[in-house]
């Protein structure tokens, strides 16, 4: 079984560690793929990130992907239009309008921490149905738990449980990510699975959330970069 962590921040965004440090640590922990989530600042930044990833790729066996995390609906639309230029499109969750826009947008791969800074889970039954229809994975973010304390952590855990309950009922995809900003915050995949079980996921679905679900996202990213690709589900001969 291959394991993936598709939401990690390097020093290029809000992170503290280099791409190489994070990639090497992820490889040690048993991951086969890691995706660096950055904030889009333009074409020059994108090319610089690709060069840094290529440099780190030569020093590790793990496959390194590039993702961009949209922070508002305007940024989301812009990134959706240029998605073939990178691998994974993430939407920064928390704001209800952003959460809704993310699950309505087919180009979005992951809605990150939809419960962020909220007193509810950030997703309702309508949004859950949209997430399923558009294959938008709802994230369970380990860092949200790791860096919180007391009542805040209790609220976050309760909100994550609510999203897992919605996922069970409406079949929306759930993905487990570390959300790490340092190579010391990366979490091994089996610990992530164990955490998801404690939140109410059955073992099979918890494993899929760190393997099968992200693998589909990676496969879709590779297909999209093919010269034969026209749109999702449509290719030239």
Feature map (PLM): residue ranges:
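Charged catalytic cores and adjacent phosphate/nucleic-acid-binding surfaces used
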Residues: 1-36, 42-59, 73-86, 97-237
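A glycine-rich, hydrophobic loop/mini-helix early in the fold
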Residues: 63-74, 92-95
């Amino acid at each position: 079984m291959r394991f993936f962590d598709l939401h990690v921040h390097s020093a290029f965004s809000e992170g503290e560690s280099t791409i190489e440090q994070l990639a090497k640590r992820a490889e040690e922990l048993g991951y086969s793929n890691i995706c660096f989530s950055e904030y889009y600042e333009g074409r020059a930044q994108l090319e610089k990130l690709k060069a840094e990833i290529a440099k780190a790729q030569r020093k590790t066996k793990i496959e390194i992907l590039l993702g961009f995390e949209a922070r508002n609906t305007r940024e989301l639309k812009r990134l959706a239009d240029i998605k073939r230029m990178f691998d994974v499109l993430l939407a920064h969750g928390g704001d209800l309008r952003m959460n809704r826009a993310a699950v309505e947008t087919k180009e979005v791969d992951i809605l990150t921490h939809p419960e962020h800074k909220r007193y509810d889970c950030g997703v309702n039954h309508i949004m859950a149905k949209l997430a399923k229809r558009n294959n938008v994975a709802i994230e369970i973010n380990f860092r949200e738990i790791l860096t919180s304390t007391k009542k805040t952590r209790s609220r976050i855990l309760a909100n994550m449980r609510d999203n897992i309950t919605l996922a069970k009922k409406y079949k929306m995809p759930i993905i487990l990510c570390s959300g790490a900003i340092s190579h010391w915050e990366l979490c091994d995949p089996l610990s992530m699975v164990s955490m998801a079980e404690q939140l109410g996921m059955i073992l099979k679905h918890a494993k899929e959330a760190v393997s099968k679900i992200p693998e589909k996202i990676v496969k879709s990213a590779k297909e999209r970069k093919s010269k034969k690709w026209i749109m999702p589900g449509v290719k030239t001969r």
